[in-house]
From Swiss-Prot:
Mitochondrial matrix membrane side: 1-8
Listed name of the protein: Ubiquinol-cytochrome c reductase complex assembly factor 6
Function: Required for the assembly and stability of the mitochondrial ubiquinol-cytochrome c reductase complex (complex III (CIII) or cytochrome b-c1 complex), a multisubunit transmembrane complex that is part of the mitochondrial electron transport chain (ETC) which drives oxidative phosphorylation. Mediates early complex III biogenesis. Participates in regulating the levels of electron transport chain proteins, and therefore energy supply, in response to changes in energy demand. Also required for cytochrome c oxidase complex (complex IV) assembly.
Family that this chain belongs to: Belongs to the UQCC6 family.
UniProt organism field: Pongo abelii (Sumatran orangutan)
Amino acid sequence: MPAGVPMSTYLKMLAASLLAMCAGAEVVHRYYRPDLTIPEIPPKRGELKTELLGLKERKHKPQISQQEELK
């Protein structure tokens, strides 16, 4: 096994790591409960909290790298 660790110790660490990962995911999922409701009327533009503000209309031109200018 890696670094000379016995197989039993390796499997115990693997099991403990997986258990901790699953427990952490469960706690986070219970704390941040997803909103699974589906509205009958779709929300108007801008009402969704998940809408990215960076994708809206830009006020300035994006910078072009020097490599792209040379092409």
